[in-house]
């Protein structure tokens, strides 16, 4: 999958999810559904972030246009995340994983909704 295509699938797990502060970035995006991705751990320190490890991560999968993807990617990459490709039940999708060592509190369930 290439992010140069007309539309791109993304998997989001934190502040871009429904009901979260940055979900407005996904206005007009096509919601494909929820999934759990194996091989990731969720942490929280001011912001949520996922790192590779033993665990699972709850994601929402969307199809977005190229412009939306590029806008989100610029923000995520600029704050320390890196873009990776993951497998979901909806097909391959891009996910932003944390680019450094884990810190903060681990959310063992892998679900950002547990953070209040």
From Swiss-Prot:
Binding residues for substrate: 13-16
Enzyme class: transferase
Annotated keywords: Acyltransferase, Transferase
Record's keyword annotation contains Acyltransferase: yes
Top-level lineage group: Archaea
Any one Pfam family match given in the protein's UniProt record, by short name: GGACT
The EC number(s) this enzyme carries: 2.3.2.-
Matches recorded under InterPro entries: AIG2-like_dom (IPR009288), GGCT-like (IPR013024), GGCT-like_sf (IPR036568)
Entry annotation: catalytic residues: 76
GO MF: acyltransferase activity
Function (record text): Putative gamma-glutamylcyclotransferase.
Family affiliation: Belongs to the gamma-glutamylcyclotransferase family.
Record protein name field: Putative gamma-glutamylcyclotransferase PH0828
Organism: Pyrococcus horikoshii (strain ATCC 700860 / DSM 12428 / JCM 9974 / NBRC 100139 / OT-3)
